Amino acid sequence: MVNGWLNLDKPTGMSSAQAVTQIKRIFGIKKAGHLGTLDPLASGILPIALGEATKTIPYLSCDLKAYNFTIKWGKQTTTDDLGGDIIRTSDIKPEYNQINCAIKDFIGEITQTPPQFSAVKIKGARAYKLARSGQKVNIKPRQVKIHELKMIFLDTINNIADFSMICGSGVYVRSIARDLGIELNCFGHITQLRRTMVGDFKEDESVTIEQLTKKNTTTYSPQCLTLDTNTYKSCNGQKILGAYVKNNVRDEIGLIPVLDTGMTSEGGMTEDDGGNTKGFIIPIESALKSMFKVEISLEEAEKIRKGQEIILNNLRNLKNYDIFCTIVGNVPIAICSFTHGYVKPIRVFNILK
């Protein structure tokens, strides 16, 4: 059974669900899920949880996302991208200073209405399904945050502009194109969209479906991955970092055996001397590196695996309802909450043998 995360570089022309289906087939597994949805016409980072890692999806931070995209001015479409029908046109060609002035209104906390063709749920149904059936879709605007929005290229001949953006969760790039076009009175839609970051998942550490189909993805080696301290230690000649907490005391180094290849101390993929990249799985422990970890005994682990609550000493730093991960050695046991002095299992990992 494969358990861990995959930092997938999704190609264009494939939905997020289709990407997950292909990954299931490649790894021969039945359970997988993705963190955040990426439009079929978009490419880039789509983190995919495999096996028991699917239980960690709600606990992974994806508050920061990064995108590169191109807007074509002069046309607004039903889908706010190339795939829709044209509904409004304009002959206006916005100038460099006009665009730079307009994008200032899109930085910070803004109110944004998702596209009609989006995965937003309306009374239990996806908005895009309602829109495709011809129903009128009424999507409520919501507050989102844009940390950075820059125009990096303007082609006045072809009437297109390239942008880079760092934003919070829930932002629709297609809505940015739509609203910016309306602001400039020239209309606009997305022609290219690429996501380069989702939380800790970065573009330069990703893998493509083509790479996965060519390489052996189930070869193990004793290489190591990071957890969450600034303490460095060598493992098989590679500088790595990692530590775990034992009863709330960070006093031991924890080295995590992972698939060959592993990650570097900076989080990037490593390759063996022959350049044969064999392993792309990020262990559950590493994906949860920002979550507080507490080591427990095998006896305590068995109780938690059965859904029983336990009492642990020396958890004074935890507040009521704090979430943390219990581990035995380097093996995650469960995501737990600290409730009125008890350690209560929320999601138990079926990994420990």
From Swiss-Prot:
Gene3D superfamilies the UniProt entry points to: Pseudouridine synthase
EC number: 5.4.99.25
Catalytic residues, chain numbering: 39
Molecular function GO terms recorded: RNA binding; tRNA pseudouridine(55) synthase activity
GO biological process terms held by the UniProt record: mRNA pseudouridine synthesis; tRNA pseudouridine synthesis
Record has DNA-binding as a keyword: no
Catalytic activity: uridine(55) in tRNA = pseudouridine(55) in tRNA
Top EC class for this record: isomerase
InterPro entries linked to this entry: PsdUridine_synth_cat_dom_sf, PsdUridine_synth_N, tRNA_psdUridine_synth_TruB, TruB_C
A UniProt-annotated Pfam family: TruB_C_2
SUPFAM superfamilies: Pseudouridine synthase
Keywords (A to Z) from UniProt: Isomerase, tRNA processing
Summary of the function given for this chain in its UniProt record: Responsible for synthesis of pseudouridine from uracil-55 in the psi GC loop of transfer RNAs.
NCBIfam families attached to this UniProt entry: TruB (TIGR00431)
Family under the similarity heading: Belongs to the pseudouridine synthase TruB family. Type 1 subfamily.
Official protein name in the record: tRNA pseudouridine synthase B
Organism field: Wolbachia pipientis subsp. Culex pipiens (strain wPip)
Designated gene of the protein: truB
